[in-house]
Amino acid sequence: MKLIKLKLASFRNLQNIELAPGKKFNVFYGNNGQGKTNLLESIYLLATMKSFKQARNAELIAFGGEFALVKGTVERDQVRREIAVLIEKQGKKAKVDAKLMTRLDDFFGNLNVVLFTPEEISMVRGGPDLRRRYLDRAVFTCDLGYLTAYHDYAKILKNRNALLKVNETAGIEVWTEQLVQAALLVIERRKAYLDRIGRLLQGFYSEISGNDETVQIEYRLHGVDARLFAEDPAEALNQALRAHAAEERRRGSTAIGPHRDDLYFGLNGRGARQFASQGQQRSFVLALKMAEIEHITRCFEAPPVLLLDDMTSELDRERNRNLMEFLKKREMQVFITTTSLHNVDVDELQDNRTFRIKEGKILD
């Protein structure tokens, strides 16, 4: 899977861009604030219809503009397709080969991407929202039904919270029953992904670290009896919701569910957040991204496009080398941003292209 052409119109500070990326390594360099991350954001949006910065539609449109357009030509198995996302303040529209997609499931999967940003390096030591965000992105790529399951859960959660905010008990049981059923679908899909990724994680971590440390990744239910959940998931969630009923009325929001769950990262049987060194934590996240890439490659029988946003400043020389060696072995396309070419050993990257970005313009 390769992005052969990219065209942008009025996307943030990238006004009129036409780009023909190389099939392997593409390095974009320039000072901060010139548009490097915006370029990666446009590719991510072309694949997922979302901004990885969690930006509103209006923020994606250039100042004074009415809309933004992101269009790309994607090649897979020698077949090319043109995909496009039109961004307006009131919403987005997706097209494949000029045909408007009424079902987004028909749009997703034409371009698969894996994102690696400085934010994700802090995933181990950061808050649970960072880990949930990573997990949701990762699950969705190979399980398109997950998006529907999560949106259904989010709608039910919103309605239940609306009742809790006004301390309305009438009707809460109906929404609680729906919440539990929707939550189980989300949790099931999240756990299934972690089971698959966990088998790959150890091998990549050992390759990076060069030692026999053991790593674990587990799903942690917030406020739910894990043993009871293993026996009777629905009853475990219902029991937890009953136990937190007073807290929910006081806070005006739902205290139990996938929106509160977390991931546990373990190293040698202890929590990586508390006991792993900074270097070990970075190795863990790097191994996690490698496992994600491998999982997507197996899922689609084609590697995803990798987006590396200023990672050379976050990884030390050894980990950078390990990552690049991993990428060299795979027929995957990579987009790298950096403030200086000195941060990337370009001469060691085969089939590389470099682009300078200045004030929203790309200079070859």
UniProtKB/Swiss-Prot annotation:
Residues given in the record as ATP binding sites: G30, N31, N32, G33, Q34, G35, K36, T37
GO terms classed as biological process: DNA replication; DNA synthesis involved in DNA repair; double-strand break repair; SOS response
Chief subcellular location: cytoplasm
Domain of life: Bacteria
Compartment(s) where it occurs, according to its Swiss-Prot or TrEMBL record: Cytoplasm
GO molecular function, one term: ATP binding
Keyword Nucleotidyltransferase in annotation: no
Gene Ontology, cellular component aspect: cytoplasm
Keywords: ATP-binding, Cytoplasm, DNA damage, DNA repair, DNA replication, DNA-binding, Nucleotide-binding, SOS response
Keyword ATP-binding: yes
SUPFAM superfamilies, sorted: P-loop containing nucleoside triphosphate hydrolases (SSF52540)
Pfam family for this entry, one: SMC_N
InterPro entries: DNA-binding_RecF, P-loop_NTPase, RecF/RecN/SMC_N, RecF_2
Similarity comment: family membership: Belongs to the RecF family.
Record's function text: The RecF protein is involved in DNA metabolism; it is required for DNA replication and normal SOS inducibility. RecF binds preferentially to single-stranded, linear DNA. It also seems to bind ATP.
HAMAP family: RecF (MF_00365)
This protein's name: DNA replication and repair protein RecF
